[in-house]
């Protein structure tokens, strides 16, 4: 199946807080719109029509298979984009607007079809009337002179056509016409339907990404659908969360509750909760903020915007340090538990996976560099962790999982909220090693954790020979975010870089058995962890 996606324009100004992005690469719940369409029409050939900021689309879609990005010579109306996309195409095809996600699959419908929804006529959408699938009237984003409070059909932006060559003919004729209030695309659709009537199908699973108010509503609904343990009351703006991982979840709830009053600004407002082991839950205020994870992967922010973000994070990091605890023996036990014991236990769990057998016994090749086996690395860690990390006797309040996905920021980059805290560091609850917080941030900026968990990397591997060759598909940016972050956190990083990198390496090495659903991700994490560890201590052979 051929899928044509017109995406010639950037999103409207009220959605440009992430940058001047075309809709096709705009994020919805931590995934770009194209990712939803790619999975919706799996196995299809895609043609994305671009003009404004086309380079960004080319870069972001370069690692998808069977995707052709076509740049227009000049910007025209919607019909111009579609005409370029279907030129020299014939047979069946799907046209899916770049700002439209519909969970119903039109590909399963025989013949010509289109999806519609209903609303009161307005300038927001294009409305239509049909007679047995023949489009007889179109109101193209124009407010009619007469007041009409009745619901009318509107195009959501998904069409299946059985004869692309005839649509091309209809578009050619429509593009020759002048001074029409109706887009050439819809004039062509009207003419096409005279010969090939549509099955006009109502959908309730339509997410509109093209308008700010609808975008945030769509983001909310997609989030609720994709996470089984989250329910969102849209009317009240309340998110209720449950979890099967009861111990961890209760620790999370208690972290929210134990925060000192003057630090509660960092968390969502809590309305109700239960820490009952049988049915724990928490209901909290829902924020339609983007996560730093989304900004990092999909945003197009300036250096000044990133500086503001990092300064906001630094303020919270520093503010947490107003609350400290000292208990030498208990702190040392917590450090050992979190850094050494946990890593060794995770390695023991990984050993049970036969796919990793050779990695424990044989030298490991990562991008051509030879490292010691994991059995030997284990012995190295038993020496280097106590030497470098057992040197503090004071903890302060920490979040415990301060990765980019757990940090939300408002559209003006002024207010930060943190979610999904760990709630446990050894035998401590809200207290822990502040270097652990920095390592969590490093593992996004330095180790590219966010790219790995979204499969934004290339990898070849040979399990029998313990060989990994991988490359993270990092973003092309005008600013070095790692350097910018280190500059903002200069005082915190100075003198601690190797210790932070050691903890960062341990994060990658200890998370491998937790990602058993993807051997690719596991091996990318292993390669990354060994590369970072080698900066701290020589593990080459």
Predicted regions and their residues:
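Conserved N-terminal catalytic core of the sugar/cofactor nucleotidyltransferase
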Residues: 2-13, 19, 26-95, 177
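A glycine-centered beta->alpha junction motif in the catalytic cores
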Residues: 9-12, 276-309, 315-325, 353-361, ...
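Active-site acidic catalytic loop and adjacent metal/ATP-binding pocket
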Residues: 379-432
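Conserved kinase catalytic-core helix
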Residues: 259, 295-357, 374-391, 491
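Conserved alpha/beta core of the MobA/IspD/sugar-nucleotide pyrophosphorylase nucleotidyltransferase superfamily
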Residues: 3-6, 152-235
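Conserved core of the sugar-phosphate nucleotidyltransferase
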Residues: 101-178
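Active-site activation/catalytic loop segments of kinase-like enzymes and analogous catalytic loops
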Residues: 422-488, 505-519
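ATP-binding glycine-rich loop module of kinase domains
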Residues: 227-258, 285, 292-302
């Amino acid at each position: 199946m051929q899928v044509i996606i017109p995406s010639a324009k950037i999103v409207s100004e009220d959605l440009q807080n992430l940058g001047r992005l075309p809709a096709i690469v705009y994020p919805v719940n931590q995934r770009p719109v194209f990712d939803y369409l790619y999975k919706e029409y799996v196995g299809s050939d895609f043609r994305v029509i671009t003009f404004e900021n086309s380079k960004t689309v080319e870069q972001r879609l370069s690692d998808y298979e069977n995707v052709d990005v076509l740049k227009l010579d000049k910007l025209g109306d919607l019909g111009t984009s579609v005409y370029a996309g279907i030129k020299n195409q014939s047979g069946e095809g799907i046209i899916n607007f770049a700002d439209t996600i519909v969970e119903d699959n039109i590909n399963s419908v025989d013949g010509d079809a289109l999806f519609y929804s209903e609303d009161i006529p307005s300038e927001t959408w294009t409305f239509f009337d049909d007679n047995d699938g023949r489009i007889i009237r179109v109101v193209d984003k124009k407010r009619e002179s007469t007041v009409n409070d009745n619901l009318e059909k509107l195009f959501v932006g998904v069409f299946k056509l059985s004869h692309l060559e005839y649509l091309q003919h209809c578009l050619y004729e429509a593009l020759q016409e002048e001074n029409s209030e109706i887009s050439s695309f819809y004039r062509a659709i009207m003419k096409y339907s005279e010969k090939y009537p549509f099955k006009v199908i109502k959908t309730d699973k339509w997410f509109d990404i093209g308008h700010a108010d609808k975008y945030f509503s769509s983001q909310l609904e997609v989030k609720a659908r994709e996470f089984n343990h989250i329910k969102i009351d849209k009317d009240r703006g309340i998110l209720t969360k449950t979890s099967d991982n009861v111990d961890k979840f209760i620790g999370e709830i208690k972290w929210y509750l134990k925060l000192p009053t003057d630090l509660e600004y960092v968390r969502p407002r809590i309305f109700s909760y239960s820490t009952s082991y049988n049915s724990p839950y928490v209901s909290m205020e829902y924020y339609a903020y983007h996560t730093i994870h989304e900004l990092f992967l999909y945003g197009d922010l300036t250096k000044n915007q990133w500086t503001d973000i990092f300064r906001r994070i630094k303020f919270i990091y520093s503010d947490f340090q107003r609350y400290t605890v000292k208990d030498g023996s208990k702190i040392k036990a917590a450090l050992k538990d979190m850094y050494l014991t946990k890593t060794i236990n995770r390695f023991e769990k990984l050993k049970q996976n036969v796919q990793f057998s050779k990695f424990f016994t044989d030298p490991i090749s990562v991008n051509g560099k030879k490292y010691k086996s994991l059995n030997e690395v284990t012995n190295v860690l038993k020496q280097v962790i106590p030497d470098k990390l057992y040197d503090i006797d004071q903890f302060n309040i920490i979040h415990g999982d301060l990765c980019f996905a757990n940090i939300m920021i408002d559209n003006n980059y002024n207010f930060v909220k943190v979610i999904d805290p760990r709630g446990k560091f050894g035998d401590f609850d809200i207290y822990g090693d502040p270097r652990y917080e920095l390592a969590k941030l490093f593992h996004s900026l330095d180790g590219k954790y966010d790219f790995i968990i979204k499969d934004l990397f290339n990898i070849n591997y040979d399990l029998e020979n313990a060989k990994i060759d991988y490359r993270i598909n990092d973003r092309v940016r005008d600013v070095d975010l790692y350097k910018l972050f280190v500059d903002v956190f200069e005082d915190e990083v100075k003198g601690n870089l190797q210790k932070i990198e050691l903890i960062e390496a341990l994060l990658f090495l200890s998370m491998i058995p937790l990602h058993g659903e993807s051997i690719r991700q596991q091996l990318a994490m292993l390669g990354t962890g060994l590369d970072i560890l080698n900066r701290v201590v020589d593990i080459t052979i």
